[in-house]
UniProtKB/Swiss-Prot annotation:
Involved in the restart of stalled replication forks, which reloads the replicative helicase on sites other than the origin of replication. Can function in multiple replication restart pathways. Displaces ssDNA from a PriB-ssDNA complex. Probably forms a spiral filament on ssDNA. This is Replication restart protein DnaT. The gene is dnaT. The lineage of its organism: Bacteria, Pseudomonadati, Pseudomonadota, Gammaproteobacteria, Enterobacterales. Keywords: DNA replication, DNA-binding, Primosome. One of its GO terms (cellular component) is primosome complex.
Length: 166
C-alpha cells in the first residue's frame, strides 16, 4: 500500500478538513498517521477501481483473448464447451470418465447452470461437469441393473454361522 500512497497527512490535520484534503488529492490514496505511525488509509473509489479492475489489468498486460477467457470468472452460457483434453483433466481430478461428453449431457448441464446464474472460472466449470457426469452416469448404471420390475426378492432359509438356528 505504501507504494500507492501519494500523500502522508497527520490525523489532526486530516480531522480539521477531511473533504478538502480528499478532493485535493490526485492519486486517490492518502496515508493518515499519528505519532509517525499509519493509523488508516483513505482510499477513494477511483483508486479501488484501478486496483481491482481486471479489464485494465488485461489491457496493461498482453494476454490473449483465449487466456483472458480462461482466467476470468463468468456465468454459464449456451456456447460454453469443455477443453479437448477434458477426459484427461477429469482423470487428474480423480474422476474416471470412460467416454466423451455427449451433446445431451452437455446441454443438460448448461441449461441447469445457466438458470443458476453463478460465476466460476473455466476450470471450475469443467470440474463441475466432470462431477455431474460421474454422478449421472453412475445413477444410470444403477438404474439399468434394477430394470426388472417384476422381480420379487425371496429370502433364503440359511442361518449364517455364529447365529442360533432352529
Amino acid at each position: 500500500m505504501k507504494i500507492l500512497v501519494s500523500k502522508k497527512i497527520t490525523l489532526d490535520l486530516f480531522c480539521k478538513n477531511p473533504i478538502q484534503i480528499i478532493e485535493k488529492e490526485k492519486n486517490e490514496i492518502i496515508s493518515i498517521s499519528k505519532n509517525k505511525k499509519t493509523v488508516f488509509y483513505v482510499i477513494q473509489p477511483k483508486a479501488l477501481k484501478k486496483l481491482f479492475d481486471i479489464k485494465e489489468y488485461f489491457v496493461k498486460s498482453k494476454i490473449t483473448k483465449k487466456e483472458k477467457k480462461i482466467i476470468e470468472k463468468f456465468p454459464m452460457h449456451t456456447n460454453w464447451i469443455p477443453d479437448k483434453d477434458f477426459i484427461q483433466k477429469a482423470a487428474l481430478w480423480g474422476i474416471s470418465l470412460n467416454e466423451e461428453v455427449s451433446k445431451y449431457e452437455l446441454a443438460s448441464f448448461i441449461s441447469y447452470w445457466e438458470a443458476e446464474g453463478l460465476f466460476f472460472h473455466h476450470i471450475q466449470w469443467q470440474q463441475k461437469l466432470a462431477r455431474s457426469l460421474e454422478r449421472s452416469r453412475s445413477m444410470n448404471n444403477a438404474i439399468q441393473q434394477k430394470k426388472d420390475i417384476t422381480y420379487i426378492p425371496v429370502p433364503d432359509q440359511k442361518t449364517p454361522d455364529g447365529f442360533r438356528g432352529k
